């Protein structure tokens, strides 16, 4: 029996979801990614603290902006940014 695995981490799934759906609620993100709302809440907080996303209030909802110029801090990535990864995976400009 083979184990199921994801190509992207949960953090990556949430970032990619927010690229297309910047005003998604935590519940909507959870439903789209298959994660619990609690896990999504924690990951969104970590992404904010790591300066990967910015959150702002729009009416009664939050809207998220991806910091596309944020450099990924890992030797394997070199100077690649979130935008570079998005272009590769989703064909983003």
For each of these PLM feature ranges, what is it?
Residues 3-11, 25, 57-78:
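Short, cationic-aromatic polyanion-contact patches
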Residues 28-31, 48-49:
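Alpha-helical residues within the helix-turn-helix
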Residues 44-45:
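Short, hydrophobic-biased segments on the C-terminal half of alpha helices
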Residues 48-58:
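A short, conserved structural fragment
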Residues 71-93:
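Amphipathic alpha-helical dimerization/coiled-coil segments
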């Amino acid at each position: 029996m083979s184990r199921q695995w994801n190509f992207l981490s949960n953090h990556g799934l949430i970032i990619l979801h927010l690229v297309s759906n910047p005003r998604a609620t935590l519940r909507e993100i959870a439903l789209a990614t298959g994660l619990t709302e609690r896990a999504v809440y924690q990951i969104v907080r970590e992404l904010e603290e790591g300066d990967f996303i910015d959150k702002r209030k729009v009416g009664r909802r939050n809207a998220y902006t991806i910091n596309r110029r944020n450099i990924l801090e890992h030797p394997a990535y070199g100077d690649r940014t979130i935008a570079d990864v998005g272009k590769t995976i989703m064909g983003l400009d």
